[in-house]
Structures are given as C-alpha cells and as structure tokens.
Amino acid sequence: MDQSARYADLSLKEEDLIAGGKHILVAYKMKPKAGHGYLEASAHFAAESSTGTNVEVSTTDDFTKGVDALVYYIDEATEDMRIAYPMDLFDRNVTDGRMMLVSVLTLIIGNNQGMGDIEHAKIHDIYFPERAIQLFDGPSKDISDMWRILGRPIENGGYIAGTIIKPKLGLRPEPFAAAAYQFWLGGDFIKNDEPQGNQVFCPLKKVLPLVYDSMKRAQDETGQAKLFSMNITADDHYEMMARADFGLETFGPDADKLAFLVDGFVGGPGMITTARRQYPNQYLHYHRAGHGMITSPSAKRGYTAFVLAKISRLQGASGIHVGTMGYGKMEGEGDDRNIAYMIERDEAQGPVYFQKWYGMKPTTPIISGGMNALRLPGFFENLGHGNVINTAGGGSYGHIDSPAAGAISLKQAYECWKAGADPIEFAKEHKEFARAFESFPKDADAIFPGWREKLGVHK
C-alpha cells in the first residue's frame, strides 16, 4: 500500500521544521529492497515508525494524523532519507513529565529495522529541538569537576592521564590493587575494564577497599589527588545501586574521587538514567562495549558512533568513550573528532544538522584503545586540544620501566604537543617519554622513522 500521500511531504523545508521547534529530525541512509519505490518505502518506514501500519485502520482520526511522522527529504542516489517526528509522539515519564530515550529509540530505530521492504536503514544524524533538550537530564558532572579535584583550572584544565587495569581479567584482589598503586604513582585516573566487577576470584567487597587503600597511599606519596572509575554495571538496577552504595561507603571522604562506570550500550538507556538520577554527585562514565555491531561503518543498520555519543549526552553521561580517531587500535578515522566536538561544545555541526545544546553540560570525550605516548602527539594535533580523559592500558603497563613511568610518559606526550616541540628532541630531555620509544618499537618505527639513531638507542 502506497502511504506517501499521508506520510510524506517533500514540500516541507528543514529550516522551517527547525524554527518551529516541534519535531525531532532524523537523517537515515536507507535503501529499499528491489521492486519497491524509494518514496513509497520511505513513507511506509515513517508510518511504521509513528502512527501507521501496512493497512488503513478504522480507528484513525484527524488528531492521530496530526502526529504522523513525515518524510520531508529523499535522495535515492545517495540513499538519504530524512523524517520529522512530532515531539508529542514520544512517551513521557509519569513521575516528572520528562522524556525517555527508550521511547525515542523504539520509534526512530525500532520495528523499522526489520521491515520486509527495506534493505537497510541507519541513522547518521539526529536533531533535537530546544524543548527536547530541556526534557532530558543531561550530565550533572563534567570534566571541570575532575579538574577541580586534581587541583587544576576548571577551564582548559588539560589532559587527564588514565589507564585500565590490565590484564582485564584474571587478577586477584591484592595484585589488582597493587597494579592500581603502581599506575597512580604517575597517573591520574584508573577505570575498571568493562568486564571487571565481582568475579569469584576477585570479589568486589574485598578488592575495592584495597583499591581505596592504594589510592590513599599514592595520594600521600605524590601529594596529588587520584581518581577511580568503578564498574557498577549489572542486569538489575538494585544490584547496580548496591554496588554504587558500597563504593561510596568504601571511599567515604574521598567519594568525590569515585566515578561510576556503566556499560550503557549493552545495559541500555535505563541503566544510564538510573545511575544519572540516583547518583547525581558522581561522574557518570559511559562505556560503549558492543556498539560496533551497529555503529561500525561496515554495518548498514542501527546508528553511527556519532549518534550514540550525541544521545549519551542527552541521557546524562559525564564522559563517553569515542575511540581514538584512527590513532589507536580500534576502528576510526581523523574525522571522528566531530564526535568529540558535538558532545563537548554548546553548539556544533553534525553530518547533517547543526545542533545547539542550550547550556546543557558537556560530555567528556574518553580516548582508549591501543594508545600510548608515541601516538598521542598526532592525536592531539588532529583533535586540536587535550581536554580529554585517556585510558591507556597497554600504553601504561607496557612501558619498559614501570606503570608509573608509562603514566608519566603519557603526560609528557601531552606537554610535548602543547609546547609544539619535535617529539624526538623532546624525548632527549624527558626520560619516560624517551623510554616509550623502546617500549613500543613497532609504533616508533612507523611514526618516527630513524628514531634509534636520533636517540642513540642503537649504540
């Protein structure tokens, strides 16, 4: 059934829809299956994503038609399809009238992903009007709170050198806490790796007090504050809160130095919102493990990493992993810096839409995945700043001297870039950075050919 007369209006202008402020706009890359017209398939897609089905129903009235999603732009050659969703379509909380991301996702990326006449459809950008921004929580804490704890300026406080305890699984409580202490002697921030929680060989109630003891000893020894991101992910929200409450009790007077890590992609929006609302005084660390199944450029369905990061800010993530923009081991490219710009700025241009955030707090880009001191100067040059959290596991624990030296080498890499210095020349005056060349020789060969002769390592 051709529903384009009802669910498509190509006379609508995008600028008018944005100015009206009553629609969430979604840009897809969509391809119909063979034998289906592009406009017809687009209209069916909009119908299935809002008020319609595959047949006319007798219960539809004029009000219902007033909240139809409308296709307002198509370009079959580029597979571009854009749909305007009226704000009134989306579910609101009974308790406070606020919007919920599960409702948004259910419509814009729900049943339409399994339609018989659609070959594939993937969201590449989404626009939220001011009213929608107001109806989501947004972050309660941001990187400025981390800088304050670390004793830095709360504007442009710079690079936060972090790590992930490695190996990711298999350490018992005492070795785990010892690994944390070794890094904190040089670094700022440690996160649980996403599988770490309450394994039988490393019970949470045994390991966490030891980690806090490591933090206190490192703080006493260095005279500097330290930060820990604790994984509270669980199937059950009450289990999440039990873990979080134990963390706050354990860290006591240092509870402000405790962030909560949530596996938001596998756990779902409810897990992020629970953490955001129940613990507004903690930095909410959004880990996105599993996202690649839909965000990968090779995937034709779902949504992109850009869209994932954007909706994480709406939900209230203080920070989210954004990959390494082609400088680490994960999928990515230099243009992924636009992901960071979208979540850290008050307004930014996306692939399709220019988004204003109307004062919503920023979400920190968290950089991880195969990074070390040698890769960082190029990364910072591409991004244009160093106001990020970087969790370098191998880049710290793989340093030839010690995890603390690995942490120091990361900080020195930032200072090298910030000073505009030549990394080889900078290494001659900074031992830990220089030893990173010997620690990661394959990277050194690829990024800095001839480094052995220049640093005298061949002698």
UniProtKB/Swiss-Prot annotation:
Induction: Form II RuBisCO is expressed in the presence of form I, when grown in air with or without 5% CO(2), although it is not the major activity. When the form I gene is disrupted the RuBisCO form II activity increases, but is not found in carboxysomes (at protein level).
List of residues that carry N6-carboxylysine: K191
GO MF entry, a single one: magnesium ion binding
Residue positions binding substrate: N111, K168, R288, H321, S368
Pfam families (alphabetical): RuBisCO_large, RuBisCO_large_N
Chain residues that bind Mg(2+): K191, D193, E194
Keywords assigned: Calvin cycle, Carbon dioxide fixation, Cytoplasm, Lyase, Magnesium, Metal-binding, Monooxygenase, Oxidoreductase
Similarity comment: Belongs to the RuBisCO large chain family. Type II subfamily.
More info: The basic functional RuBisCO is composed of a large chain homodimer in a 'head-to-tail' conformation. In contrast to form I RuBisCO, the form II RuBisCO are composed solely of large subunits.
Protein name from the UniProt record: Ribulose bisphosphate carboxylase
UniProt gene name: cbbM
